[in-house]
Amino acid sequence: MAPRRRRHTRIAGLRVVGTATLVAATTLTACSGSAAAQIDYVVDGALVTYNTNTVIGAASAGAQAFARTLTGFGYHGPDGQVVADRDFGTVSVVEGSPLILDYQISDDAVYSDGRPVTCDDLVLAWAAQSGRFPGFDAATQAGYVDIANIECTAGQKKARVSFIPDRSVVDHSQLFTATSLMPSHVIADQLHIDVTAALLSNNVSAVEQIARLWNSTWDLKPGRSHDEVRSRFPSSGPYKIESVLDDGAVVLVANDRWWGTKAITKRITVWPQGADIQDRVNNRSVDVVDVAAGSSGSLVTPDSYQRTDYPSAGIEQLIFAPQGSLAQSRTRRALALCVPRDAIARDAGVPIANSRLSPATDDALTDADGAAEARQFGRVDPAAARDALGGTPLTVRIGYGRPNARLAATIGTIADACAPAGITVSDVTVDTPGPQALRDGKIDVLLASTGGATGSGSSGSCAMDAYDLHSGNGNNLSGYANAQIDGIISALAVSADPAERARLLAEAAPVLWDEMPTLPLYRQQRTLLMSTKMYAVSRNPTRWGAGWNMDRWALAR
């Protein structure tokens, strides 16, 4: 975790990068007037919901698609750091201890349906992700759990957010950013209630109904009428949803009510990754591909395309189900002893990853996290695995987000290595998203990135991503619960001192490698493939991917 001064320096640098991409795209359109009207963009996985804050939504490719339809007080730039979005509003520090922040939404901020963006949306985001209100299927409580209260007058543009004493979250800039603020008036209109009043007064029956709609009302399904799309999926950004196609693609069009700089390209169709990417690249029917490296096999780059491979902030890992054959730590450790982590990482072209609580960055803290404890799980040891099971056979079902050639090969590698230990590993096809399949007991292990994601899955913050193993957190898919680890994760969120963070990580590592809720494999690598005629597309290691600035993209005809 970088100290605060360094983080501010990187944010300033990102503003320069953003300006450069804007100049490049503007130069194309202003000088030549030849920008294409449409771009086709392929992302990691299914687009199942507009609400990327649910467990399923956070693990999907939704953040890649909707970073510029649902804006917030910041967005994640090309290095994964949060950049202030002053088009949306401003954040000011009122007091440092306890931490008190004032959030001021732009007077011009309005949804595509004509309704104003208000502090009610902040109250809903906090309530859904704070862990205080039952029923919300939120992916994470990180940061929001430390908010003591929000002062908001319904319908107004300003909110004061007060944190619990001694809980001054270091990465508070991660809160209320792009894709985190859902339009609360959609729920208010359906229930005919004052959502903010119901939440702040903790009206139990109303909260139950609000949570139910927050979880499901923004599910993306083909066949919705134009009026329903307009009313249910309003946008607060440069793009808005026009339609959902039968094959799951989402069509975005320029939002004529957007109050900032207008989108350069008028239409972007966002496609879930399919098995036909190579064919689509060969026939030039796709302009930008933003997926996990190796997921499409040996993707050949034609002369008319350019390709960049780079590390994400997410960790590819085995996430063990809380029930079934791997419910006990003994059997999880046995499986880990026969997983060839060295060979799997080598196939991905990267070192083995060991960190669970400092996963988002490559630095000295991350490199040291769990390194000593992980040594016994670095190479295949089928004899030790067999002994750990007492010679009892074990069957393990592993699932993953399809299609993904690299993960399919990984499961095959694990199956071959574990067979001598009496462990039968099978590759299981499921008809539900990976996190749901794990919850439902359809698989014993989910092979995925941070939070069960098909893509990066990372927030870009080590402290925030560590909540994946905090009890009660939605994307704690293994159902892991350990009071000591909860305390360490909580302490990491409010500490910027490298020495203290190193101490906390060293305390956690022996516990986590003994209880084995997950098995980290390697840092997920990304492939960004684009037409040589594309302008202003840049990489991003977080779950928002290349879509973080899609309103600046331009395709030369």
From Swiss-Prot:
- Keyword field: Cell membrane, Lipoprotein, Membrane, Palmitate, Signal
| Signal sequence bounds | 1-30
BP terms from Gene Ontology: peptide transport
Q: Transmembrane residues, as ranges?
A: none
InterPro entries, sorted: SBP_5, SBP_5_dom
Q: Which GO terms describe its molecular function?
A: peptide transmembrane transporter activity
| SUPFAM superfamilies to which the protein is assigned, alphabetical | Periplasmic binding protein-like II (SSF53850)
Topological category with respect to the lipid bilayer: Lipid-anchor
S-diacylglycerol cysteine lipid sites: C31
The organism's place on the tree of life at top rank: Bacteria
Identify the Gene3D superfamilies for this entry: Dipeptide-binding Protein, Domain 1 (3.90.76.10), Dipeptide-binding Protein, Domain 3 (3.10.105.10), Periplasmic binding protein-like II (3.40.190.10)
Lipid-bearing positions (N-palmitoyl cysteine): C31
Q: Where in the cell?
A: Cell membrane
- List the GO cellular component terms: cytosol; extracellular region; plasma membrane
For this protein, the record's PANTHER family field holds:
MONOACYL PHOSPHATIDYLINOSITOL TETRAMANNOSIDE-BINDING PROTEIN LPQW-RELATED (PTHR30290:SF65), PERIPLASMIC BINDING COMPONENT OF ABC TRANSPORTER (PTHR30290)
What the record says about family reads: To M.bovis Mb2616c and M.leprae ML0489.
Q: What is this protein called?
A: Uncharacterized lipoprotein Rv2585c
| Originating species | Mycobacterium tuberculosis (strain ATCC 25618 / H37Rv)
